[in-house]
Amino acid sequence: MKNKYIEQFEAKQIEGKNVPDFRAGDTLKLAIRIKEGDKTRIQNFEGICIARRGNGVSETFIVRKIGANNVGVERIFPIYSESLESITVLRRGRVRRARLFYLRDRRGKAARIKELKK
């Protein structure tokens, strides 16, 4: 059981955030606030969510994209991070796993995920 003060603090952190419902296999577009010196700017990061773990304030997710020269780039984000401006779900993926770490070994068309039909 958590301390009531910790629970209040965590509830305050989660309070203002509007997080869409997404899971592993979904293609996400993230708007990340980056601070360089005294300036801040928004950088977009688009990729496939390959894992989601934890709960509450400490919940994180991993997004993987294939960058220049077919180099895979993975970033781990806390869901309730202040640096995340927005999370947009571009497409829903049809997968049968909660962790898609096998995509790390795949290249090209083999790394694609089928879209979920509604």
Curated annotation (Swiss-Prot):
InterPro entries in alphabetical order: Ribosomal_bL19, Ribosomal_bL19_CS, Ribosomal_bL19_sf, Translation_prot_SH3-like_sf
GO biological process: translation
TM segment ranges: none
Key words of the record: Ribonucleoprotein, Ribosomal protein
Gene3D superfamilies: 2.30.30.790
Statement: the UniProt record of this protein carries the keyword Ribosomal protein: yes
Annotated Gene Ontology cellular component terms: cytosolic large ribosomal subunit
A GO MF term: structural constituent of ribosome
One Pfam short name: Ribosomal_L19
Family named by the database record: Belongs to the bacterial ribosomal protein bL19 family.
NCBIfam families for the chain: rplS_bact
Function according to Swiss-Prot or TrEMBL: This protein is located at the 30S-50S ribosomal subunit interface and may play a role in the structure and function of the aminoacyl-tRNA binding site.
Protein name (Swiss-Prot/TrEMBL): Large ribosomal subunit protein bL19
